[in-house]
Regions:
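Tandem CBS (Cystathionine beta-synthase) repeat/Bateman regulatory domains
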Residues: 1-181
Length: 181
């Protein structure tokens, strides 16, 4: 009787998005290029997370990290924000535009979030939740046998939680829904 009421355990592969739903950027591309690609992803309704790959021919399929909207905003302001923390209140006028323009020639590798963890696609969803929390990430690569086969995103987990709350327990398929971050 208890087994009839227990929901089946969901796996990472039930929620991950395949790699073809993401745009790729080479690690040596400029922030200006990255911003254009991020805008393209947004307009296409794709995840606003760019996959950063190596720039060398031998590394072109090696995933080095991700660039998210947070990486773009805070990555351009890194030295300024660190200085502001130490000195306290400062004069802000014109600072945002100046920092943005100064940072346009930075490289994707300078602002990306490197991959610090991954989860196997065959793991239970709770393992992904644990790792996302542990590393304070929103995205996590999902590994098949020996390579990255997809990416699980916290928004897709949240979508499932919302479905659970509304009584739609069986619906675990990931829909392509535009989201921010």
């Amino acid at each position: 009787m208890l087994s009839e009421t227990m929901p089946s355990e969901k796996l990472v592969k039930d929620f991950m998005r395949p790699l073809d739903q993401y745009h790729y950027v080479k690690e040596e591309e400029t922030v200006q290029d990255v911003l254009q690609l991020m805008d393209k992803a947004r307009q296409e309704g794709k995840p606003q997370c760019l996959i950063v790959v190596g720039g060398e021919p031998s590394e072109k399929e090696m995933i080095k990290g991700f660039v998210t909207p947070s990486d773009l905003v805070f990555g351009l302001m890194t030295h300024f924000l660190k200085g502001a923390e130490k000195s306290g209140p400062i004069f802000w006028e014109g600072q945002f535009e100046a920092e943005c323009l100064d940072g346009m020639n930075k490289r994707a590798r300078e602002i990306m979030t490197p991959i610090r963890a991954y989860v196997r696609e065959s793991e239970m969803l709770m393992e992904a939740v644990f790792l996302l929390n542990k590393y304070q990430e929103d995205f996590l690569p999902a590994i098949g046998k020996e390579e990255v086969v997809g990416i699980i995103h916290i928004h897709d987990i949240l979508t499932h939680m919302i479905r659970l709350a509304s009584g739609k327990r069986g619906a675990s398929e990931v829909r392509s829904v535009p989201f921010h971050k």
